[in-house]
Amino acid sequence: MKTVSIIGGTGYTGSELLRLLSTHEKVEVLNVTSRKEAGKKLTDFHPQVRNLRNYNDLEFQNIAPEDIDTDIVFCATPHGASMAIVPILHEKGINIIDLSGDYRFEDIEMYESWYGLKHTGKIESAVYGLPELHREKIKKSKTIANPGCYPTGAILSMAPLVANDLVDERIIFDSKSGVSGAGVEASQTTHFPNVNENLGAYKITKHRHSPEIGKELEYLGNKKLKVSFTPHLLPVTRGILTTAHSYLKEDVSRADVIEIYEEFYDGEFFVRIFEEGMVSLTGVRGTNFCDIGGFEIDQHGRIVVVSAIDNLVKGASGQAIQNMNIIMGFDEKMGLSVGGMRP
């Protein structure tokens, strides 16, 4: 049995890690850290995992990274905090999955520009952890940068078309997310009366996930792209629906496009291609699946692809566990083989 620590266990991603790991056959959570809640019972803060595994016996701890000695560490800390922790764990040879944005960019200047932070802990061997595109690199690394929630759904929705050079450089992503994507701390934007029965765009052209989407698709297609991304906040708890638009470079049919997607994602358990019907948030809620559908082509040659993920699972904690499974040589589906909660 491999041992796990969760650094930053009071947020939504930490909570979701606990829920999902409760069914994992080959790992046990030993430490869950929180400076603010240190000494408090884990299940008093997260009652949803009461009576599962050893969770009733755990308390939040304030442990320095130097004192952590488990096989795996999930770093569920805010952007900027991870860069002070990950290098210490890396030196100790611990397997790390970092859920912040601190290690998603090889180009440090790009990170500093979009996140407004000075990066002080670069690790050359860190790998961007989108398994469907980088599985072989993930297998060889001990430090994984878990992708952002919006980029996961966006990249997977367009990857087959970009990889096959079927669309021009203009790609537009319109994404709508549940409120949990904003994190556990309440704000004026996420306050219930302001979100309920409402829908609004935010950071219309300057969301920090934009360059993450762009650099991954440019790497895949080996060319410069003009990627545009606009997020919206939905009055729902969890889920991201992404509508991706681009223009085809050649005359292909909808059937051709579907065949390309099915071939590209052949063998990928967590990507489900919908030839008919429409993908939905309820279909992926609580799961590590990315559902992709639409594939409609209009009279101008514009192709529209729609993806759906759970922002807390495939967009965060589930994908982190998927990455852990790959690193440790476990069955990739372990702890993640559940269907959506529909209705």
From Swiss-Prot:
The active site is at 149. It is found in: Cytoplasm. SMART domains: Semialdhyde_dh. GO terms for cellular component: cytoplasm. Keywords: Amino-acid biosynthesis, Arginine biosynthesis, Cytoplasm, NADP, Oxidoreductase. PROSITE patterns: ARGC. InterPro entries: AGPR_AS, AGPR_type-1, NAD(P)-bd_dom_sf, NAGSA_dehydrogenase, Semialdehyde_DH_NAD-bd. Its EC number is 1.2.1.38. Coiled coil: none annotated. It catalyses: N-acetyl-L-glutamate 5-semialdehyde + phosphate + NADP(+) = N-acetyl-L-glutamyl 5-phosphate + NADPH + H(+). Pfam families: Semialdhyde_dh, Semialdhyde_dhC_1. Pathway: Amino-acid biosynthesis; L-arginine biosynthesis; N(2)-acetyl-L-ornithine from L-glutamate: step 3/4. Its main location: cytoplasm. It comes from the Archaea. GO terms for molecular function: N-acetyl-gamma-glutamyl-phosphate reductase activity; NAD binding; NADP+ binding. It is an enzyme of class 1 (oxidoreductase). CDD domains: AGPR_1_C, AGPR_1_N. Belongs to the NAGSA dehydrogenase family. Type 1 subfamily. Catalyzes the NADPH-dependent reduction of N-acetyl-5-glutamyl phosphate to yield N-acetyl-L-glutamate 5-semialdehyde. This is N-acetyl-gamma-glutamyl-phosphate reductase. It comes from Methanococcus maripaludis (strain C7 / ATCC BAA-1331).
